Amino acid sequence: MLVNRWLFSTNHKDIGTLYLLFGAWAGMVGTALSILIRAELGQPGALLGDDQIYNVIVTAHAFVMIFFMVMPMMIGGFGNWLVPLMIGAPDMAFPRMNNMSFWLLPPSFLLLLASSMVEAGAGTGWTVYPPLAGNLAHAGASVDLTIFSLHLAGVSSILGAINFITTIINMKPPAMTQYQTPLFVWSVLITAVLLLLSLPVLAAGITMLLTDRNLNTTFFDPAGGGDPILYQHLFWFFGHPEVYILILPGFGIISHVVTYYSGKKEPFGYMGMVWAMMSIGFLGFIVWAHHMFTVGLDVDTRAYFTSATMIIAIPTGVKVFSWLATLHGGNIKWSPAMLWALGFIFLFTVGGLTGIVLSNSSLDIVLHDTYYVVAHFHYVLSMGAVFAIMAGFVHWFPLFSGYTLNDTWAKAHFAIMFVGVNMTFFPQHFLGLAGMPRRYSDYPDAYTTWNTVSSMGSFISLTAVLVMIFMIWEAFASKREVLSISYSSTNLEWLHGCPPPYHTFEEPSYVKVK
């Protein structure tokens, strides 16, 4: 029965499918919001109205894309579908908790949408800094609803993290050590640890903000001995690990895709890849104040956060060059998934380079809160995380659905998206260097040219989304079933065919370790 199968599911494949569908839908909402932003900025002058409504849209765009698109698709979708298959487990460790993790997300999304429907909306930016987020500048229920939304999404992620950690550590076959699990499994494990350690700090920060707003506490109010900078420290102690949470599963996906389409049986430097991810995860927790170079930190504090941030480039470089080494000498198949993966490697590296620029505290004084920062993080998210999701999606679509995508449409989709995102975000580096600030709905007309180019690019990206929807419809309409799969010991998830049966590995799997 439909209700029993889809509402009360305890099956990792069905829950993974729910996550993917929810993430895709949220992604379209987030895309619509981004199109509104770029429409407003396409030329000087007002389109939507004042800066409050503009900032409500910007804030909602960020929250929707981060908490309801990237995280549900990468961790909930790919994680649920693939982790049990890759380690030979019958399901997740806590199947009912898995269902609850998913069903906390729609109510959370509803609360976020409600926050923009009441009063003037939450126009705080995704950082929700007080005093702007306090009850003077944002009277009414909007910010409170946003905080409750974040609480639900956070609980969902924490439960999911506990589930993945338990599954990966406890549900491997006895003969399989942790260092024999695929890189995607490692990436999800490390991501889960980051979630478990960082989200409670966010919960504390936004709960203190909630009591400041409603119960007359003064955690972030100097009038009562509080300090708004405390909120920034709490938020960014979560916020920086969060950006690694968004990209780490992508690293895992790219490792699998690059290995598969290079005709290699294993990625180059497996151990180096694992340690690099662990290093990135650890370092992600000790660099948070690089988001705060303009708030008046001591010079020695700034020196530390600058150098610590630059250190992250080393394990990241290990990963990039290992992917290139995996490609080297391989029998490369130019499939759509491989194109997404190669696009990821190139554009993620560009985003990483601008990150190195921003890690310099002296330069960041000039670039902070300009479009240079926007360009930087959209290169690593809109062309890192999203390209990784697309690579994983077109690679594993036959596994999830049993049908194959049309190769030509998939390549066309990649080409349109590649042009669109680059045309959107590359000019923003110029705007930032010229001093255009973020989070404003209008600008001096000296900035018109590049904003117009950027907005045109965003409509090309929108076209790519429409092509993708058609491409998926075409696959299900044509029903081209998978005939054969090139299966090897390093891509265990394909073992049961496409799609795999509802229950896999019902008996403990026998793994012979070479």
UniProtKB/Swiss-Prot annotation:
There is a cross-link at residues 240-244 (1'-histidyl-3'-tyrosine (His-Tyr)). Residues 1-11, 87-94, 171-182, 262-269, 328-335, 401-406, 479-514 are mitochondrial matrix. It is an enzyme of class 7 (translocase). Mg(2+) binds at residues 368-369. Na(+) binds at residues 40, 45, 441. Fe(II)-heme a binds at residues 61, 378. Binds 2 heme A groups non-covalently per subunit. Binds a copper B center. GO terms for biological process: aerobic respiration; cerebellum development; oxidative phosphorylation; positive regulation of vasoconstriction; respiratory electron transport chain; response to copper ion; response to electrical stimulus; response to hypoxia. Its EC number is 7.1.1.9. It is a multi-pass membrane protein. Residues 41-50, 118-140, 213-227, 287-298, 358-370, 434-446 are mitochondrial intermembrane. InterPro entries: Cyt_c_oxase-like_su1_dom, Cyt_c_oxase-like_su1_sf, Cyt_C_Oxase_1, Cyt_c_Oxase_su1_BS, Cyt_c_oxase_su1_dom. It catalyses: 4 Fe(II)-[cytochrome c] + O2 + 8 H(+)(in) = 4 Fe(III)-[cytochrome c] + 2 H2O + 4 H(+)(out). One of its GO terms (cellular component) is respiratory chain complex IV. O2 binds at residue 244. The chain crosses the membrane at residues 12-40, 51-86, 95-117, 141-170, 183-212, 228-261, 270-286, 299-327, 336-357, 371-400, 407-433, 447-478. Keywords: Calcium, Copper, Electron transport, Heme, Iron, Magnesium, Membrane, Metal-binding, Mitochondrion, Mitochondrion inner membrane, Respiratory chain, Sodium, Translocase, Transmembrane, Transmembrane helix, Transport. Cu cation binds at residues 240, 290-291. Component of the cytochrome c oxidase (complex IV, CIV), a multisubunit enzyme composed of 14 subunits. The complex is composed of a catalytic core of 3 subunits MT-CO1, MT-CO2 and MT-CO3, encoded in the mitochondrial DNA, and 11 supernumerary subunits COX4I, COX5A, COX5B, COX6A, COX6B, COX6C, COX7A, COX7B, COX7C, COX8 and NDUFA4, which are encoded in the nuclear genome. Belongs to the heme-copper respiratory oxidase family. This is Cytochrome c oxidase subunit 1. It comes from Rattus norvegicus. The gene is Mt-co1.
